[in-house]
Design a protein with these regions (language model features):
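A generic structural signal for short beta-strands and their flanking turns/coil linkers
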Residues: 187-189, 204-206, 229-233, 268-272
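Catalytic core of DAGKc-family lipid kinases
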Residues: 24-25, 38, 46-47, 55-57, ...
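ATP/nucleoside-binding phosphotransfer catalytic cores, i.e., glycine-rich phosphate-binding loops
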Residues: 2-11, 18, 25, 195-197, ...
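ATP/NTP phosphate-donor binding region
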Residues: 1-78, 88, 124, 313
């Protein structure tokens, strides 16, 4: 099924503007980046930010409350310091507000930043956040919560659930590999998927993925055609079962040839519903959210404004 939508045409980037009058920083205090939060504060003050709101949180799940406080205080730009989990929580709170987000990638994988070309370089990330091109980007929404990079269930959800904070904190991306090896024998379950109102898949499956961007967990380029501004989500389902199947599948995915795998099917859509015969763990942007037998997923076009590198840079 061809569900590709017309992509919004690129427009000429706006000239660099002075920093917003009211800038809020929402920071995961346990994450490190460059010279740390002291350097960030110094750079923002030196850049001439008119009013600086500052919020630090010990866990990403506490970030939405701080984002809402920033919006209530008149924030014109929200800078997010942390990884994909922190970005997801803040994006969920900012969705539909029209207030831009600047990303300061201080996490383990920083996949949303990677897909947008935002470097792990504090001075440059700050420059992009203050003066970069502001793009209206899509978000996905699964069971009522927004995601920026991807969501998944089955093998993917189990992997994320077991790559717990302690393991991930100590070993970074290796944590995903380690836990992945523990789940390659994960069971397949009867899975029914409808895309934009039409039946698309009805068979045994081990994993279902929804992508807003191309590069997902583990740095794998799973969705070649994904763009975060095209009004659609990529939908992938895998029937791989066992170490040999998964080795072949992940090998193709790592090489950017997902659609060549005999164990993978991919399509695109705006609204997706999934039913499993047994509850499966699902995750979004690297954060596990428990088990469900039904998933309701949709794209929310232009939900989030993000400060991105200028193509001319």
């Amino acid at each position: 099924m061809d569900t590709r939508t017309a992509e919004r045409p690129d427009t000429a980037p706006a000239p660099a503007a002075p920093p917003a009058g009211v800038v809020a920083v929402v920071a995961h205090r346990k994450k490190t980046f460059g010279g740390g939060l002291d350097e960030l504060r110094s750079r923002l003050v030196g850049a001439g930010v008119g009013r600086l709101l500052w919020y630090e949180v010990p866990k990403s799940r506490k970030a939405p409350k701080r984002v809402r406080a920033a919006l209530d205080s008149g924030a014109e730009l929200v800078l997010v310091w942390g990884g994909d989990g922190m970005v997801q929580r803040c994006a969920d709170a900012l969705a539909g507000s029209g207030v831009p987000m600047g990303i300061l990638p201080a996490g383990t994988a920083n996949l949303f930043a990677v897909n947008l070309g935002i470097p792990v370089d504090l001075p440059e990330a700050v420059r992009i956040a203050l003066h970069g091109r502001r793009r209206e980007l899509d978000l996905g929404r699964i069971n009522g919560e927004h995601f920026a990079v991807m969501a998944g269930a089955g093998f993917d959800g189990d992997l994320i659930r077991d790559a717990d904070r302690q393991l991930k904190g100590r070993f970074g991306r290796i944590a995903y590999v380690w836990t992945g090896l523990r789940h390659v024998r994960g069971e397949c379950v009867r899975t029914r998927i409808r895309v934009d109102g039409a039946d698309w898949f009805d068979d045994e499956a081990s994993c279902v993925l929804f992508g807003n961007v191309g590069t997902i967990t583990g740095g794998i380029p799973a969705f070649d055609d994904a763009r975060p501004d095209d009004g659609a989500l990529e939908v992938g389902v895998s029937t791989a079962s066992g170490a040999v199947d998964w080795a072949r599948t992940l090998g193709r995915m790592a090489a950017g040839r997902s659609e060549e795998s005999p164990f993978v099917r991919i399509t695109r859509g705006r609204k997706i519903s999934v039913r499993f015969d047994a509850p499966k763990t699902y995750e979004l942007d690297g954060g596990a959210r428990g088990k469900a037998k039904r998933l309701k997923v949709k794209v929310v076009p232009g939900a989030l404004t993000v400060c991105c590198p200028d193509p001319a840079d």
